[in-house]
C-alpha cells in the first residue's frame, strides 16, 4: 500500500480530502484484483463516473465514490461480487455488506485506515452496446507508490458513456452528472452516435425498467433548470471551482444536437413496447 506521503500528495493536503483520496487509491486495488482474477476477460467493463475519471480525466476529473460495472449476464455479475468479497491484495482488504444479487456496499481496510466516506458497487447484467476500448488508466503520481503497474482494462466508448450520462440526467438531476457532461463534452464527439444511443437507452429505461414516462422529449435533456434545486452532494470536495450554473449553460449548448431526431429516432421517442423489433434492429446496427 502507498505511504502517507503519497496519499497526502494525491489530495494535495486539502482539508477533508484524505477519505476520498484513499478511496480513489483503493479502487485501483479493486481493479487490479479483478484483473488478476480474470473477471475482465469475461466481458466485464468498468463504467460510470469512476471509469471517466480513471481513463479519461485523471486528476483533472472528480473523485467518484462508486464502482459501476457492466457484465454480460447476472451470473457474471454475481461472480464479480463473489470475487471481491473478503479478498485481500497487498494489504488492502475488501468486504461487501448490504448485498443484493447486483449491488452492495463496499467496505475497505487499508494499512492507512478505512475511507471515511461510503462506497457502493453495482453491476448491470447487460453488455454495453459499443465495443469497449482497452485503456491504461491515466498515469498519476500516486501510482508510483503502488506495488504493481495499472493494467490495461476495458472502458466504454466515450459516446456510449456520455449517452448513458445524458439518460441519467433525464432520470435525475445530480450535480455529478452535470459536471461529467460538462467536462467530457468539451472534445470532439460523434454526435449522431451519441444521440442514437441516448434514444435507445431512454427507450429501455422507460419500457423495460419503468424509469420515466412516455413519450420522451429530448428537449428535457437540454432544458433550463434552477441549479439551486440540485440535491447536495460532496462535489465541493471533488473539484474546484464549483460552478453549476456555468456548467449547465455549457451543457445545454453542447448537447443541443440530441433534439435533432431523424425518422427512426422520432419513432423510438414514443417509448412504445410495440417498437421492440425496430429498436432491436437499430441496436444491431450500432
Q: Which residues does each PLM region occupy?
A:
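Structured mid-to-C-terminal alpha-helical surface segments
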Residues: 1-44, 55-67, 71-286
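Glycine-rich beta-strand-to-loop/alpha-helix junction loops that act as flexible
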Residues: 46-51
Amino acid at each position: 500500500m502507498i505511504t502517507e506521503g503519497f496519499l497526502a500528495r494525491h489530495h494535495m493536503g486539502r482539508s477533508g480530502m484524505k477519505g476520498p483520496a484513499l478511496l480513489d487509491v483503493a479502487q485501483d486495488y479493486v481493479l487490479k484484483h479483478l484483473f488478476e482474477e480474470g473477471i475482465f476477460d469475461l466481458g466485464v467493463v468498468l463504467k460510470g463516473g469512476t471509469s471517466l475519471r480513471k481513463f479519461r480525466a485523471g486528476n483533472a476529473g472528480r473523485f467518484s465514490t462508486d464502482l459501476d460495472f457492466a457484465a454480460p449476464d447476472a451470473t457474471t455479475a454475481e461472480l464479480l461480487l463473489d470475487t471481491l468479497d473478503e479478498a485481500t491484495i497487498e494489504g488492502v482488504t475488501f468486504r461487501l455488506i448490504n448485498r443484493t444479487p447486483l449491488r452492495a456496499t463496499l467496505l475497505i481496510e487499508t494499512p492507512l485506515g478505512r475511507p471515511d466516506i461510503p462506497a457502493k458497487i453495482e453491476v448491470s447484467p447487460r453488455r454495453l452496446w459499443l465495443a469497449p476500448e482497452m485503456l491504461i488508466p491515466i498515469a498519476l503520481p500516486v501510482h508510483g507508490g503502488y506495488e504493481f503497474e495499472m493494467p490495461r482494462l476495458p472502458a466504454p466508448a466515450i459516446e456510449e458513456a456520455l449517452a448513458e450520462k445524458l439518460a441519467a440526467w433525464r432520470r435525475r438531476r445530480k450535480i455529478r452528472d452535470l459536471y461529467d457532461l460538462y467536462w467530457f463534452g468539451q472534445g470532439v464527439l460523434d454526435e449522431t452516435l451519441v444521440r442514437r444511443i441516448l434514444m435507445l437507452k431512454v427507450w429501455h429505461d422507460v419500457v423495460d425498467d419503468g424509469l420515466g414516462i412516455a413519450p420522451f422529449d429530448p428537449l428535457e435533456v437540454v432544458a433550463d433548470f434552477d441549479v439551486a434545486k440540485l440535491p447536495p452532494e460532496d462535489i465541493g470536495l471533488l473539484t474546484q471551482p464549483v460552478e453549476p450554473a456555468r456548467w449547465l449553460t455549457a451543457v445545454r449548448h453542447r448537447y443541443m444536437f440530441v433534439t435533432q431526431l431523424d425518422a427512426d429516432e422520432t419513432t423510438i421517442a414514443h417509448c412504445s413496447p410495440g417498437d421492440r423489433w425496430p429498436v432491436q434492429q437499430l441496436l444491431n446496427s450500432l
